[in-house]
C-alpha cells in the first residue's frame, strides 16, 4: 500500500514568420517571380516530480524495489525548428503557351532532451539515470522542384508537368541509453509526372481529365 504524488509544470509556445517578395515584368504582367521564406519554432519544456508516500509493506515483499517505487524527477526539453525557402517563376511564351517552374527547400530540425533522475527509495537524493534518459537530434532536408507547361487554344487546354522530390534524414543520439553507435542516415527521391487536359463545353461547364 502506498500513495504517489506528482507535481510539475510545463511550457509551450509557437513562433511563426514569413517574408514574401514578388516582381512582375513591366512588359508583360503575366511574367513574374516570387521569393518566399518561412520560419517556425515550437519549444516545449517540462519539469515533473513523482514522490511515493506512506509505503506499507506488511508482507515484507520489499515493494519499493519490486515495483520500482523510487522518487523521481524528469526534466524534458523538445524543439522543432523549420526553415522554408521557395521560388516560383511563371512566363508566357506567345499567346498560347505558359511555362511554370519552381523549387522549395525545407530544413527541419527536431531536438529532444529527456533526463530522468531517481532517488534511492523514497529519499530526495536524486541521481541521473542514464538508462532511462535520452537525447537525440532528427535532421530533415527536403528539396522539391517542379516544371510545367500549359497550352491554351480556344476552349482546349493541355498541361503536362513533372515534380521531383529529394529527402534526407539524419538521426544522431547524443546521450542516454541509446548511444552514437545507433546513429543513422537515409535518403530517397521521387519523380512524379502529371498531365491534365480540359475543354470548355459551355459558359459554366468544363470537362477535365488528368493523370
Language-model features: locations:
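Primarily recognizes Gram-negative and organellar outer-membrane beta-barrels
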Residues: 1-211
Amino acid at each position: 500500500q502506498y500513495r504517489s504524488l506528482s507535481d510539475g509544470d510545463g511550457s509551450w509556445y509557437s513562433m511563426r514568420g514569413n517574408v514574401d517578395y514578388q516582381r512582375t515584368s513591366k512588359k508583360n504582367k503575366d511574367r513574374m517571380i516570387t521569393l518566399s521564406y518561412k520560419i517556425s519554432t515550437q519549444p516545449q519544456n517540462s519539469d515533473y516530480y513523482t514522490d511515493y508516500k506512506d509505503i506499507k509493506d506488511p508482507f515484507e515483499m520489499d515493494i519499493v524495489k519490486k515495483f520500482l517505487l523510487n522518487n523521481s524527477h524528469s526534466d524534458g526539453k523538445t524543439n522543432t525548428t523549420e526553415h522554408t525557402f521557395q521560388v516560383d517563376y511563371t512566363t508566357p511564351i506567345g499567346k498560347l503557351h505558359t511555362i511554370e517552374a519552381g523549387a522549395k527547400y525545407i530544413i527541419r530540425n527536431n531536438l529532444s532532451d529527456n533526463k530522468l533522475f531517481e532517488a534511492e527509495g523514497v529519499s530526495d537524493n536524486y541521481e541521473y539515470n542514464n538508462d532511462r534518459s535520452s537525447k537525440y537530434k532528427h535532421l530533415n532536408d527536403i528539396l522539391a522542384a517542379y516544371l510545367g507547361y500549359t497550352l491554351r487554344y480556344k476552349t482546349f487546354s493541355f498541361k503536362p508537368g513533372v515534380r521531383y522530390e529529394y529527402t534526407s534524414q539524419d538521426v544522431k543520439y547524443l546521450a542516454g541509453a541509446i548511444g552514437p553507435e545507433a546513429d543513422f542516415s537515409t535518403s530517397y527521391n521521387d519523380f512524379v509526372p502529371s498531365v491534365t487536359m480540359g475543354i470548355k463545353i459551355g459558359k459554366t461547364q468544363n470537362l477535365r481529365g488528368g493523370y
